[in-house]
């Protein structure tokens, strides 16, 4: 079996409605994958542009004995739906999706998060959203790689 088929076969689908007004609450299928060791410390891996969660194939394999790993492909990327035009792709919409996956789908309360490239911008925005929740749902550790956004996480 090739890497792509193996990655796809290990995934599931979650449904997401865009929260960007211009997208008219259009629902999309989002590819989600959980791998590693259930019950081990949770690790959320967030992909960059123009890639997908499969970028983490080798890393997930290396870390699978030490972590319970959670990943998704943002809409328009990888194995998730490619919404038709005039869909607006938004860092904030992707951050809301990430928060939804962490808190509602995966139900993580203690986790680490590693982000890359555009995923770091999404991760920083999500961090602000997670910090505003009651109780806050921020990661224990956050590792940003190629981060380009600067978002305040302190109360105004």
Please provide the spans of the model-predicted regions.
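Alpha/beta-hydrolase fold catalytic core
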Residues: 1-43, 64-67, 89, 106-107
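Active-site loop/oxyanion-hole signature of alpha/beta-hydrolase fold enzymes
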Residues: 19-28, 33, 74-114, 128, ...
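Conserved HGGG/HGGXW glycine-rich cap/lid loop of the alpha/beta-hydrolase fold
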Residues: 31-79
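Short, hydrophobic alpha-helix immediately C-terminal to the catalytic nucleophile
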Residues: 57, 99, 124-128, 145
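Residues at the starts of beta-strands that form the adenosine-phosphate
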Residues: 68, 110, 138-141
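Gly/Ala-rich beta-loop-alpha elbow adjacent to hydrolase catalytic centers
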Residues: 115, 119, 123
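Flexible "cap/lid" loop of the alpha/beta hydrolase fold
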Residues: 127-156
